[in-house]
């Protein structure tokens, strides 16, 4: 069932079960800043893309090596890391953590003496997508993805095909965000927010273990979408009240 990210997922976020021991040693060992490890780390990223896995700290380790060894930077790897971070969470820090370790695209290309402008075009575009995702403007997000802009075309034809199921990854994190706020939502709204044809929305609901009632999708309780009234009691001591009244006199 798709729900908002729970604390139980934090360990998997930090140390995913799919991470091989040798990669774990490279990330956390004394050899973590050795640039000769880059080929192994980049191969690990390629496995992430192919298998639909995600290892934020493994990807950050690659960006850290690029930071210390800018001449080894690979623009395609950078873009794929940003795509993985973008597709991992709506409200988490993943994308910004990756972004903070990168300089301007033009500076990166200058260091590696590359004339390929894809990084210059796509990186700001991914930042735009992240802003739309972060602010839950899901319909506009899909409009950007499906647009005829140069950046969108490069993303769709050159990079997304390298990933196992990127569009469904976006749909899953959007569904998690929706599930944290709604108990019931219309299928037509869900179709727009998830960019799914109206006749396929029911299939998606089944995939994420939601039920369909008439023209609505019904989302089970998950601890965040079942708002309950509560009473907060404050125990204010006389001494505290005296200080408050005295402060109000100024």
Swiss-Prot record:
Domain PCI span(s) in chain numbering: 54-235
Q: Where in the cell is it found?
A: Cytoplasm
Q: Which UniProt keywords apply?
A: Cytoplasm, Initiation factor, Protein biosynthesis
User: Main localization of the protein?
Assistant: cytoplasm
- Please give the biological process terms from Gene Ontology that the record holds: formation of cytoplasmic translation initiation complex; regulation of translational initiation
The UniProt GO MF terms for this protein read: ribosome binding; RNA binding; translation initiation factor activity
Pfam families linked = CSN8_PSD8_EIF3K
Entry-linked Gene3D superfamilies = ARM repeat, domain 1, Winged helix-like DNA-binding domain superfamily/Winged helix DNA-binding domain
A single Gene Ontology CC term: eukaryotic 43S preinitiation complex
Tell whether Protein biosynthesis is among the UniProt keywords.
Answer: yes
Please verify whether the record's keywords include Cytoplasm. Answer: yes
> InterPro entries under this entry?
ARM-type_fold (IPR016024), CSN8_PSD8_EIF3K (IPR033464), eIF3k (IPR009374), PCI_dom (IPR000717), Transl_init_fac_sub12_N_euk (IPR016020), WH-like_DNA-bd_sf (IPR036388), WH_DNA-bd_sf (IPR036390)
Q: Which family does it belong to?
A: Belongs to the eIF-3 subunit K family.
What the entry lists under HAMAP family is as follows:
eIF3k
Q: What does this protein do?
A: Component of the eukaryotic translation initiation factor 3 (eIF-3) complex, which is involved in protein synthesis of a specialized repertoire of mRNAs and, together with other initiation factors, stimulates binding of mRNA and methionyl-tRNAi to the 40S ribosome. The eIF-3 complex specifically targets and initiates translation of a subset of mRNAs involved in cell proliferation.
Subunit structure of this chain's protein:
Component of the eukaryotic translation initiation factor 3 (eIF-3) complex.
Q: Under which name does UniProt file this protein?
A: Eukaryotic translation initiation factor 3 subunit K
The organism encoding this protein is Cryptococcus neoformans var. neoformans serotype D (strain JEC21 / ATCC MYA-565) (Filobasidiella neoformans)
């Amino acid at each position: 069932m798709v729900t908002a990210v729970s604390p139980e997922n934090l360990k998997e976020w930090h140390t995913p079960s799919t991470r091989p021991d040798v990669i774990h040693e490279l990330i956390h060992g004394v050899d973590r800043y050795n640039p000769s490890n880059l080929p192994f780390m980049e191969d690990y990223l390629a496995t992430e893309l192919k298998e639909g896995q995600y290892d934020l700290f493994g990807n950050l380790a690659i960006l850290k090596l690029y930071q210390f060894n800018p001449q080894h930077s690979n623009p395609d790897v950078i873009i794929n890391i940003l795509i993985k971070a973008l597709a991992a969470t709506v409200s988490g820090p993943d994308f910004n953590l990756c972004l903070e370790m990168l300089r301007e695209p033009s500076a990166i290309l200058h260091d590696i003496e590359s004339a390929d402008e894809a990084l210059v075009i796509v990186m700001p575009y991914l930042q735009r997508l992240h802003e739309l995702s972060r602010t839950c403007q899901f319909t506009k997000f899909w409009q950007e993805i499906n647009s005829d802009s140069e950046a969108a075309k490069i993303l769709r034809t050159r990079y997304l095909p390298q990933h196992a199921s990127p569009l469904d990854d976006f749909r899953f994190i959007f569904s998690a965000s929706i599930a944290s706020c709604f108990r019931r939502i219309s299928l037509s709204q869900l179709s727009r927010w998830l960019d799914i044809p109206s006749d396929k929305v029911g299939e998606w609901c089944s995939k994420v273990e939601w039920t369909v009632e008439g023209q609505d999708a019904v989302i089970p309780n998950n601890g965040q979408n079942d708002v309950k009234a509560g009473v907060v009691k404050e125990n204010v001591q006389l001494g505290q009240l005296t200080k408050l009244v005295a402060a109000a006199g100024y």
